[in-house]
């Protein structure tokens, strides 16, 4: 009988887009029968109180220095191994705004975790005003975060004009391969059903241009 793999979800995005709030919104909807663990940066956008999460029965591991892209390797491996001892159903990872999401995914797919983990839906939270700004769109880090995600989340939509949102959707529709889902949210509130949206592994790669 094949070993059941633990699902892993990555939430990436630039600083200030609402990644931590998005993670908290998912936690608030968690099935009480599911066991989650969380891997976060030492310094989140608005902070995740490890003590509070422990009270809720959700183990939390923090990467020292606050940057998963720098910690991919021994620190990240050690944190993952510790979390897996809890035999979780899901691992939720909030990446630093400076993290290359593809590097984090590569670490998850490498030994010794390849046989233990299933890379499930990957989220990237963006501010549509940045997404349509060429100064952001041409940054390698930004393209990496956009390219690796399955679900592109437009946050802070209440601060955008209708024209900006229309341009966001126009550009998002032209991404190749297309995203499994492109959504608008307010206050970074995600739908927990998106965690189990079907994803295609080969659709994740680093875009050359938006």
Language-model segment annotations:
Residues 2, 151-154, 160-210:
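C-terminal accessory "lid"/substrate-recognition subdomains
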């Amino acid at each position: 009988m094949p070993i059941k793999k633990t699902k892993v979800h990555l939430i990436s995005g630039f600083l200030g887009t609402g990644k931590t709030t998005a993670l908290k919104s998912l936690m608030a909807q968690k099935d009480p029968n599911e066991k989650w663990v969380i891997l976060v940066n030492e310094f989140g956008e608005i902070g995740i109180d490890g003590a509070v999460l422990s009270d809720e029965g959700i183990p939390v591991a923090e990467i020292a220095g606050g940057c998963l892209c720098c910690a991919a390797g021994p620190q990240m491996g050690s944190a993952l191994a510790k979390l897996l001892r809890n035999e979780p159903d899901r691992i939720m990872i909030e990446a630093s705004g400076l993290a290359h999401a593809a590097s984090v995914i590569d670490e998850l797919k490498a030994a010794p975790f390849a046989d233990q983990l299933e890379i499930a839906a990957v989220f990237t939270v963006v501010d549509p005003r940045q997404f349509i700004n060429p100064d952001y769109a041409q940054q390698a880090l930004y393209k990496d975060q956009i390219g690796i995600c399955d679900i592109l989340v437009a946050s802070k939509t209440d601060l955008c004009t209708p024209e900006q949102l229309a341009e966001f959707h126009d550009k998002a529709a032209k991404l190749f391969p297309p995203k499994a889902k492109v959504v608008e949210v307010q206050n970074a509130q995600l739908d927990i059903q998106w965690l189990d949206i079907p994803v295609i592994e080969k659709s994740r790669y680093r875009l050359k241009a938006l």
